[in-house]
């Protein structure tokens, strides 16, 4: 069963562009990871939201321990208002299967 993750990242205002650049540099490598079905960065005025979908909990676990995130850590050091808020979700299917879940 797929696993959905929503991560909220709040960059310090003076580092916003650098944080976005770090993510855009990392995203292609994550897209190539086994089990990555979606890894999409979104933004509003003060925060970034990463919406992820993984083929399984094992795929998510491998991602969280993988080289792409390990390499990204130093690029984000000192540039965030605090740790990312990461929420791991299971779908509650409802209505049309194509529209009722990620």
Q: What is each model feature region?
A:
Residues 9-19:
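Short, surface-exposed ligand-recognition loops at beta-strand->loop->(often short) alpha-helix junctions
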Residues 11-13, 56, 90:
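Non-catalytic surface loops within mature trypsin-like serine protease
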Residues 16-18, 59, 95:
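Intrinsically disordered, low-complexity acidic/polar segments
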Residues 25-37, 53-87:
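An amphipathic, aromatic/His-enriched active-site/gating alpha helix that lines ligand/cofactor pockets
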């Amino acid at each position: 069963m797929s696993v959905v993750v929503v991560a909220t990242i709040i960059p310090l205002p003076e580092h916003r562009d650098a944080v976005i650049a770090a993510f855009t540099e990392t995203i292609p490598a994550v897209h190539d990871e086994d089990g990555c079905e979606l890894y999409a960065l979104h933004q509003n005025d003060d925060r970034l939201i990463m919406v992820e979908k993984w083929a399984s909990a094992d795929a998510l676990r491998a991602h969280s321990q993988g080289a792409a995130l390990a390499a990204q850590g130093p690029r984000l050091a000192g540039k965030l208002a605090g740790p990312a808020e990461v929420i791991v979700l299971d779908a509650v299917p409802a209505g049309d299967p194509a529209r009722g879940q990620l």
